[in-house]
């Protein structure tokens, strides 16, 4: 069976996204635990201004996701027919769009009622589910060789 091969641009954009999304997601968990916590909190608190850390990851992710989206709808558009590939991009777009619509002081001031914040929380959950679905469908479709093809050049 031939080894799967991925284009270099896809590997770079996917790799950067795969690095930044978990960092943004985990920093968002810390922010949620510190400022909201309606559905639970972490059993510890971390020092620092995590709203700014989370926003920095979002700011780094924004141009990478934009380029990844352009690639996905250009040379990679045939891969979007598989919902396991399309779903994470849609969840990421919702997360970034709703994050851009928020003001960073809302959480510090306890303003949890804004629509943009509710959408951002929804996107946060959807992104976790979408990445899990992405990995499961990838493993079902091509197994470990396909997964490892994103890491090998």
Question: What is the predicted role of each segment?
Answer:
Residues 1-153:
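Membrane-embedded alpha-helical bundles that constitute the cytochrome b-like, heme-associated redox core
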